[in-house]
């Protein structure tokens, strides 16, 4: 998936965290009660690579529209996932194909919204705002008074970001519109996880569902896009960036996630997710030359604090589209 889980939280025995885009509740504790250095390295890699993928897409926004980039990056991921899972050997049926189409469409829409947002916002700002949506799950289903402080800090962070949008100006309106796109991306992020959780609950291979969904969505959005924007010039650099973004955002989680789910507890995963917006802001500085202002840093600090607080909140109910018979949720 595209970004670390913005809604993963700590658990207590018999309780389960809410799933998120890339990370999902693994075992309550890692083997031996400790997480090894290799797992920490994988979690750090997930955070860094995901942020790099989004920022790298920003380098070709001047060449192609956000919608175009969103469906194009689905193609390399679809090829890899289909080659790995061989969905033709599985029985998806009409229901499975329907879920696959929905998953593919949600991924394409998420990419379009996020890339539209970073057209006028810093990468870290767009990612931070999108991750605030997941805090609502903790607010509704969480336990303890801390869950009320988290959304308050997140709201304050969003206000700080919005304060920089000069009212009545073209740039100000574009920034506010991009902030709304970021929030919408957060909603789509949660919807993607719910659909993949449903696919797992019904016994479908999530890699196969994603692969089939990606290729169908890419064909559909590609045909639509060709009639509106036309296909941009496919030079070597453009194709290389598309493949790199696809690998960083979609292929990477499939490879690394199995290690994390088997060995890292939910709290550890949630702690790493907290720093995803900060890493995304650094990626924006390195790849796009985006220099954050003091207000950007304040807003980022507030939202990071909100994510940190919520990462320690226990979430109920126990089961949200969990794997059949296990009570757990996993995500590719």
For each feature predicted by the language model, list its residue ranges.
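Hydrophobic transmembrane alpha-helices of multi-pass small-molecule transport proteins
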Residues: 81, 132, 146-167, 274-275, ...
């Amino acid at each position: 998936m595209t970004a670390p889980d913005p809604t993963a939280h700590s658990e207590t025995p018999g309780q389960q965290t809410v799933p998120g885009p890339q990370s999902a509740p693994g075992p309550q504790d890692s083997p031996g009660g400790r997480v090894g250095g290799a797992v920490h390295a994988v979690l750090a890699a997930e955070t860094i690579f995901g942020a790099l993928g989004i920022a790298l897409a920003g380098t070709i926004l001047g060449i192609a529209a956000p919608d175009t980039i969103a469906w194009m990056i689905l193609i390399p991921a679809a090829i890899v996932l289909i080659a790995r899972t061989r969905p033709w050997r599985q029985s998806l049926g009409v229901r499975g194909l329907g879920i696959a189409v929905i998953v593919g469409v949600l991924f394409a829409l998420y990419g379009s919204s996020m890339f539209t947002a970073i057209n006028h916002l810093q990468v870290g700002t767009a990612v931070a705002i999108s991750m605030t949506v997941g805090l609502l799950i903790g607010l509704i289903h969480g336990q303890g008074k801390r869950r009320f402080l988290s959304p308050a800090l997140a709201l304050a962070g969003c206000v700080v970001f919005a304060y920089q949008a000069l009212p009545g100006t073209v740039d100000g309106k574009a920034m506010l519109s991009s902030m709304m796109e970021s929030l919408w991306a957060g909603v789509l992020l949660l919807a993607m996880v719910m659909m993949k959780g449903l696919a797992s609950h019904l016994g479908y291979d999530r890699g196969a569902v994603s692969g089939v969904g990606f290729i169908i969505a890419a064909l559909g959005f590609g045909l639509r896009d060709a009639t509106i924007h036309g296909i941009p010039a496919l030079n070597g650099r453009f194709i290389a960036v598309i493949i790199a973004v696809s690998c960083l955002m979609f292929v990477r989680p499939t490879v690394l996630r199995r290690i994390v789910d088997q060995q890292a507890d939910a709290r550890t995963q949630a702690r790493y997710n907290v720093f995803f917006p900060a890493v995304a802001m650094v990626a924006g500085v390195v790849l796009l030359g985006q220099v954050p202002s003091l207000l950007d840093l304040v807003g980022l600090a507030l939202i990071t604090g909100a994510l940190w607080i919520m990462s320690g909140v226990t979430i109920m109910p126990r089961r949200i589209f969990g794997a059949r018979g296990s009570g757990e949720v996993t995500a590719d």
